[in-house]
């Protein structure tokens, strides 16, 4: 069997330990490496000619991307996972215990177990490359750093900074890493190895003392101060997670125990908590999301079809969506983009939008002003169809007006090449209707982004019956280059995400009209696990947008999509939400003292607000509507699989990740229970709760989606 670790000796007494996992593009730590690395460490101990050790990666742009998550699936019990953690502790303790200087030379991803490996070294130096990122993202998988990270990290950079890294899973760049003391030096990649060797030759085996301001020292250096910090961190975690995620609290406990009772006790607690977390349904759900997105990256969305190269893009419309799409095309995909708008105002808006986002990067020192200007130069503008002929893809982001979109299709077919893809960012109009104006319908596709474009990870790629496989594959590849997670969905009003969202929002509106207070509704769904409640979401998206989409969905999909008639009163009162400072909540000066409901909405709708219903019942009524419609979408072939439905709901509307998505959640509940819930509500509130035929069939046969 090919080895992962190789040891080479230099004449100056420095040994290089190179990690290079055979057949993989990135290094990941696996349990089966333990005997191999242990044997090498014994060899180093026995060789008195070795005066220092440098750890490097044999991969081009990856130090160690973390532990191989798939090995956790082999753990049948919490005890199996605890022992896996203890095995890692033993190996890292052996490395840390070497009586020669050990230096980690880091270039590329240094994450999770990779950073824990580096923390077990005596010193760390990293390259200044944009590809170098350091962090412990285990919390995002419902886990904690199980290789000693909860103990070594706070001792190296301080408790507050360590908790911030571990509780958020955020990754830091080289300059941030050296500033916080995570690494000892940052150098160009070309001299990384030489610098690491010099550090090893210098013979420093002890860590630099932690430099902290006096207030931080008082807090972190005394039991009373530490308890204040841990209690505050716990409060913040519970406020953010609503208690739905167990791992952040376990991370705090590991640090608390380790700082109070010493490193060895801390490691024992870390392993025990790691084992327990691996066995939780929350971690299983979060790991399933990780595996699903990893798997999706390998798919074209169109079988064996090969994507064409996109060397130039055009965006039609310089509004909020157009500006965002143009921005991610230049900054993420690094593809030149030409923005066309009928007005100079629209064009300056698109340029301003992109500049503002890039300038944030400069202010945060993620890039230089020269790098910002280079990316801005990729974006050009026009009010006429000039400089668009060589475009490989045109993304249309104009008003939801079918006649206008037909005009855009005809214009692009006239002005661009015969292979140019026309991708519509429509949120509700069926692509088949848009393609009706095309003489080359095989080039027409839907590419539905979510707002704000730079933040929302999902795009829906919508193929109509005549869309060619090559067009699908090219559009999917283009979306991935923009940093998006694309799901391919079948053409239908509302597609997938807006369709399941519409019924959820309609049910929330029904609850409001039954007298439930706006903030009571929102709190119930946030407690369930959504990032924001439905009324806040409607204010953010725009009440007018909802009012525009509802009739389209009702016409195409039936009575159950009919929006409550009382919403006409909101439109008559010009309530559009945050965009015009008038919605369910107060905005501007009236909202200075925190988020407050605009009480006038109750009198407008003829309501007396109450908080009579339990939060659980409110959430259940809204959520079962979403789940039931997701099943209908699967039944109709709108989505290709439960996996795509889960990813679409989590990344598109913030369905609680710890539940794994609508379909995994239904598997947890059981199809029979889902049918009982729906039929119970159907008898009370009518046929909008009628269970999907597929769900009833699954309940009868005891089947699951996965």
UniProtKB/Swiss-Prot annotation:
The keyword Cell cycle does not apply. GO terms for biological process: fatty acid beta-oxidation. Residues 308-706 are annotated as: 3-hydroxyacyl-CoA dehydrogenase. Signal peptide: none annotated. Residues 1-188 are annotated as: Enoyl-CoA hydratase. It catalyses: a (3S)-3-hydroxyacyl-CoA = a (2E)-enoyl-CoA + H2O; a 4-saturated-(3S)-3-hydroxyacyl-CoA = a (3E)-enoyl-CoA + H2O; a (3S)-3-hydroxyacyl-CoA + NAD(+) = a 3-oxoacyl-CoA + NADH + H(+); (3S)-3-hydroxybutanoyl-CoA = (3R)-3-hydroxybutanoyl-CoA. Pathway: Lipid metabolism; fatty acid beta-oxidation. SUPFAM superfamilies: 6-phosphogluconate dehydrogenase C-terminal domain-like, ClpP/crotonase, NAD(P)-binding Rossmann-fold domains. Its EC number is 4.2.1.17, 5.1.2.3, 1.1.1.35. Gene3D superfamilies: 1.10.1040.50, 2-enoyl-CoA Hydratase, Chain A, domain 1, NAD(P)-binding Rossmann-like Domain. It is found in: Cytoplasm. InterPro entries: 3-OHacyl-CoA_DH_NAD-bd, 3HC_DH_C, 6-PGluconate_DH-like_C_sf, ClpP/crotonase-like_dom_sf, Enoyl-CoA_hydra/iso, FA_oxidation_alpha_subunit, FadJ, NAD(P)-bd_dom_sf. Disulfide bonds: none annotated. Pfam families: 3HCDH, 3HCDH_N, ECH_1. One of its GO terms (molecular function) is NAD+ binding. Catalyzes the formation of a hydroxyacyl-CoA by addition of water on enoyl-CoA. Also exhibits 3-hydroxyacyl-CoA epimerase and 3-hydroxyacyl-CoA dehydrogenase activities. In the N-terminal section; belongs to the enoyl-CoA hydratase/isomerase family. In the central section; belongs to the 3-hydroxyacyl-CoA dehydrogenase family. Heterotetramer of two alpha chains (FadJ) and two beta chains (FadI). This is Fatty acid oxidation complex subunit alpha. It comes from Shewanella amazonensis (strain ATCC BAA-1098 / SB2B).
